Amino acid sequence: MINFSSLLRIVKSLKTTQWQILAGPILILMILSMMVLPLAPFVLDVFFTFNIALSIIILLVSMFTRHTLEFTAFPTILLFSTLLRLALNVASTRVIFLRGHTGTNSAGRVIESFGHFLVGGNFAIGIVVFIILVIINFIVITKGASRIAEVGARFILDAMPGKQMAIDADLNAGLIGEEKAKKRRIKITQEADFYGSMDGASKFVRGDAIAGILIMVINIFGGLIIGLIQHHMFLNKAVEVYTLLTIGDGLVAQIPALVISTAAGVIVTRVSSNQNVGEQMASQLFYNPQVILLSAIVLGVLGLVPGMPNIIFLVFTVLLFILSWWLYEKKYDLENDFIKSNKKYKFIHDAISEASWNDVELEDPIRIEIGYKLTPMTDINKKGDLLDRIRIVRKKVAQEIGFLPPLVRIKNNMHLSGNSYRIFIKGVEVGQGKCFYGRFMAIHSGRETESLPFEKVYEPTFGLSGYWIDEEFKNKAQKKGYSVIESSVVLSTHLNFLITNHIDDLFGRQEAQQLLERVTIDHPKLTEDLIPNTINLTIFHKILRNLLLEHVPIRDMRTILETLSEHADTQKDPNELTSIVRIALRKIIIQKLFNQNNIIEIIGLEPNLERLLLNSLKSGTDTIEPNLSENLLIQTKEAIKKQLLIGSPLVLLVRHSLRYFLSKFLRQNFPELTVLSQFEIIDVKEIKMTNIIGTS
């Protein structure tokens, strides 16, 4: 009995199969099969037609390619197309020898048509045309393309060290980021690989041209021998049939070869720009109307020479005159527009008033720049809820951290792509991403059963993979186990993450003053006794900023103020006062890191390493010896990896005297690592050392 559910599963799996992965192996198997298996004339027609279509596609792709690296698969495609032609030659030779005695249609309609129509059925003309095509392909196009690829590869390899140094210089100067530097290095490597591959791949085409001549000779003489001896044909009939079939076979293979060789020449001779080959040629050939005018005059003079085809020359002369006039008018209009715009600018410039302090734009504490397609997210009339989401983010940060972050300014940026956005904190870009208004992001949750028919993307906050899906797919994605969220939630979550990570940058003196005024309402006596009588606002701001730098909430202002009131008389150093306040806030710190766990799993320091670090501190240099510093960073990195594997918080426990020093040192490389002192965990019942950082 047929199991229909199994059949449905098979059909469904076929739909989800990525067939493009199998294209290469299928093509190779097809080529090998053609070399081994005898093919019917109709099948041979299909493959010859496919070969012609493939060559045309390759040529058009090379013409419309704007940059060489957009078609890096070309050398491999060149190899496959050459193998395909040779396999077709083998298959057609087999058919010609087996069935050639039956007539000129024995090897299929394509070969017969090329033999009859293109050369008029005259085998002498066919041989000459075939040899000319081979010479053009072998000596002119392929040899030139091969030489260009060889020289290009050599120049690119010679220039690689200089380009790498330029990238390193830009990276060190801060002109580009690590990600962009990596992309530029990959691009340089790909260019060298491409031209090196093209240098080798062009040898395939040259070999194919030589093979074409040899195959033609073998086919003619082999066909004559078979026709005369085995099939007892008359000499003139055998010459007519086998020569015609051989010429048709050679032409139907060499014309696509010539087309692909032309594509190879186009690829290696083009200069990378934002225009394709046609646009480059048109814009540069017809840029200057004077050149076209002089060409028309020369052509007109030649057309007046007796014996010349005067009408044809004069027609082209008139066409060039018209083209020259049109280009001149176009250039004149552009110059007029430029002059008018300059006059308009001068008029506006003259009308502009003198610069004043009102022209100075102060940097926004938090700014989001959005592309034009995201503007509906801010429009309440279009049901945009981004502004509400941002209000929720600010309230959430205020409730969790303990102070209200500054207002968020949203600005349209026409230079961004439509769906892009960038987030700035104090003028520095701290994050970017893409959102699609009106669509939803389906994020992998670990419970999903199958993929979705959309392009795979990564959400900008945590780098989780997912898809931007249309609204009608929302329920379907949820049923498959995906977490589906709105586009405004994606952006607001990213904003919340970045504000939390840069919270210390957002806490300025003004925020400290506002927070103090808010606390004064509930605890007036505490604030009056402490500020400015004991410590000034600058020290108070520095202490709170130190806490925020290590992601310690400052909600419990009563404890903070009482601790400062108790110790600020004898201690004025903000860093020392911060350490004292941290001990007072230890329960909040532990709860934030470990929730309500009775057992905490942390990273520890080996006693020998602690002693070496203490000696560095006592020497008064506040620096670590280079070898020790490198070893400490390596071992900390390994300890963090192990801590992540067991799913424990990234917490390092050290002596109180080392805590501030190590926290400052390790924060540069491991911002996610929290450093605690032994005085901050005195309330913990049980401590488990999961990893030890040592001296070796």
From Swiss-Prot:
Topology in membrane: Multi-pass membrane protein
Keyword Calcium: no
GO terms for biological process, alphabetical: bacterial-type flagellum assembly; protein secretion
Transmembrane regions listed in the UniProt entry: 24-44, 45-65, 71-91, 121-141, 209-229, 247-267, 281-301, 302-322
InterPro entries registered for this protein in UniProt: FHIPEP_1, FHIPEP_3, FHIPEP_4, FHIPEP_CS, FlhA, T3SS_FHIPEP
Matching Gene3D superfamilies: FHIPEP family, domain 1, FHIPEP family, domain 3, FHIPEP family, domain 4
Protein name per Swiss-Prot or TrEMBL: Flagellar biosynthesis protein FlhA
Organism: Buchnera aphidicola subsp. Acyrthosiphon pisum (strain APS) (Acyrthosiphon pisum symbiotic bacterium)
